[in-house]
Amino acid sequence: MGTVTRGTTGPDRLRRVERWLAGTQARRLRAAADPLVVDLGYGARPVTVTDLQRWLRRVRPDVRVVGLEVSPERVAAARAALAGVPGAPVFAVGGFELAVPGGGDPVLVRAFNVLRQYDEGEVAAAWELLRSRLAPGGLLVEGTCDELGRRSTWVALEAGGPVSLTLSVRLGGLPQPSAVAERLPKALIHRNVPGEGVHDLLRAADDAWARAAPEGTFGARQRWLATCRALRRDWPVLDGPARWRLGELTVAWGAVAPRARGRAVRHDPAHGAGNRAGGRAGSGG
């Protein structure tokens, strides 16, 4: 179930979300009875799957990473490329139903640059199906990035629904935070208009960035830190300086969820994916 993507990929393209998973979500992987992780729609080459495995092995050496693609040709090519490599990921034909060889429910699922080609109205059903396949305590990250992985965003979803939105950018050369807008997840990219939460967030971030211009004397990182500190006064920011220094900002989903009939569609779990303790404990690599 699913549609073949364009397949664009490259080494370290998804490093930002990999670093986030290995940092803020390490507890989920460590606690899993079966450390199964799925990289859905990995593209024309298997490099992002092996990149993900490398990051997660730092957390859980026995992690079991499976790359799923709806294209049999891509699966065959991945298997051939890594034939004979000890401990290589497993590759199989599959889509949103997450049918992995040998069975099992994944504790982590990454679906990057997959839903971007779908209609916005199809996102909720895809999310629901993917979430239904998660192991207890599992997490789905669904997002997108640019061709070089310098600007990226993703939604984190638990079994009950979406819990957070993360923006992650290369700070060097960043004109303003809203430059990431063209890489918003499909659920939000058409919502960057007045009256929507994500538009308000990006506008507030740009305003805070402008006010923090004097901090730029000490570098873009210090300016970003000042921007995040300012945003935390009025927005439900879930992470802290340890993650901000990496060019990240995570906010509660309820603040940016698409609005319907004048009200936001929200999900407010007791323990979100981007809790502050988890954020501060994350990888600084």
Residue spans of the language-model regions?
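Class I SAM-dependent methyltransferase Rossmann-like catalytic core
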Residues: M1-P35, D39, A44-P46
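Class I SAM-dependent methyltransferase SAM/SAH-binding core
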Residues: G43-A99
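A short acidic, Gly/Pro-enriched loop at the edge of an enzyme's catalytic core
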Residues: E97-V109
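A short SAM/SAH-binding and catalytic strip from SAM-dependent methyltransferases
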Residues: P106-A124
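A short glycine-rich, Lys/Arg-flanked "PGG" loop and its adjoining helix->strand segment in the class I
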Residues: A124-P136
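Conserved beta-strand signature within the Rossmann-like core of class I S-adenosyl-L-methionine
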Residues: L134-L148
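A conserved mid-domain beta-alpha-beta active-site/ligand-binding segment of alpha/beta enzyme cores
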Residues: G149-A226
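Conserved Class I S-adenosyl-L-methionine
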Residues: V198-G274
